[in-house]
Design a protein with these regions (language model features):
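Non-catalytic DNA-binding core/recognition domains of DNA-processing enzymes
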Residues: 1-3, 126, 178-182, 204-207
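N-terminal DNA-binding recognition helix of tyrosine site-specific recombinases/integrases
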Residues: 1-35, 74-75
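Basic, Lys/Arg- and aromatic-enriched nucleic-acid-binding interface segment
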Residues: 31-78
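A short, glycine-centered helix-capping/turn motif at helix boundaries
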Residues: 58-62, 68-91, 191-195, 204-205
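Short, basic/aromatic-rich helical patch in the C-terminal catalytic core of site-specific tyrosine
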Residues: 65, 80, 177-192, 200-201
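Conserved tyrosine-mediated DNA breakage-rejoining catalytic core shared by Y-recombinases
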Residues: 82-128
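Active-site/catalytic core of tyrosine-dependent DNA strand-transfer enzymes
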Residues: 123-180, 184, 189
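Short, polar N-cap/turn motifs at the start of nucleic acid-interacting alpha helices
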Residues: 173-174, 192-216
């Protein structure tokens, strides 16, 4: 219980933990990692090759994973165990999918994720930048597994967690999935404004959600 209380106090203070402070970086720095992989692929001529060896496939997959977690809001490890389908009829409603309808039309279907009970099935359209990178990957990954481990089998969530750390090694920081999400949220949310909203909601004896409903432009 005491540990729980300490954790909640830490979260509510909005202060970084010691470990977070040590490894904290910026979105700009994370984007640089993605651009680093792109440059590596271009300089090695990998993007123009028809067939890639294992090392080249791994470099391309690192580029893909860096893009998955920087070109859109970073989800948890739900790309682990993800399958590739081309038709919604193939969605059995149990696992997560990359729905590949065509070269310019793709989406992620999430059936299995942490908040599935309260949120239900989610479909997220893929933006054009990420779509281009996925196309490069699918040109060489002909399996129905979205991400691959070192044995060319489906990458599970545990393996993806370790892989993310390897992908972001160029930052010289220990970048975990959790830290990635904290960095992204911190740069996209006005914390002072949110604190002000919460204080006002407390003083008016209603929830912050209700307050948003009440607010008019």
């Amino acid at each position: 219980q005491e540990l729980n209380n300490q954790y909640n106090e830490q979260v509510n203070s909005h202060e970084k933990t010691e470990k977070q402070s040590k490894n904290w970086t910026t979105l700009k720095s994370l984007n640089k990692v993605r651009n680093f992989y792109k440059k590596e692929l271009e300089e090695k001529g990998i993007l123009k090759k028809e067939k890639l060896n294992r090392k080249e496939m791994d470099l391309l997959q690192k580029y893909l994973v860096s893009a998955l977690y920087t070109l859109q809001p970073p989800i948890r490890l739900d790309y682990g165990n993800m399958k590739v389908i081309s038709n919604k009829k193939e969605d059995a409603g149990k696992v997560n999918y990359l729905l590949n309808k065509g070269r310019n039309k793709k989406s992620f279907i999430f059936n299995d994720f942490k908040n599935k009970k309260s949120m239900g099935k989610r479909e997220i359209q893929i933006n054009s930048k990420l779509n281009t990178i996925i196309n490069l990957w699918l040109k060489h990954n002909k399996s129905d597994n979205f991400l691959l481990n070192s044995k060319d089998e489906i990458m599970n969530e545990n393996a993806l967690s370790k892989y993310i750390k390897k992908v972001f090694e160029p930052t010289k920081k220990d970048i975990t999935l959790n830290l990635l999400r904290h960095i992204y949220i911190s740069e996209n949310i006005d914390l002072d404004a949110m604190k002000k909203q919460k204080k006002l909601a407390d003083e008016m004896l209603h929830s912050a959600d209700q307050q948003v409903d009440y607010a008019k432009k």
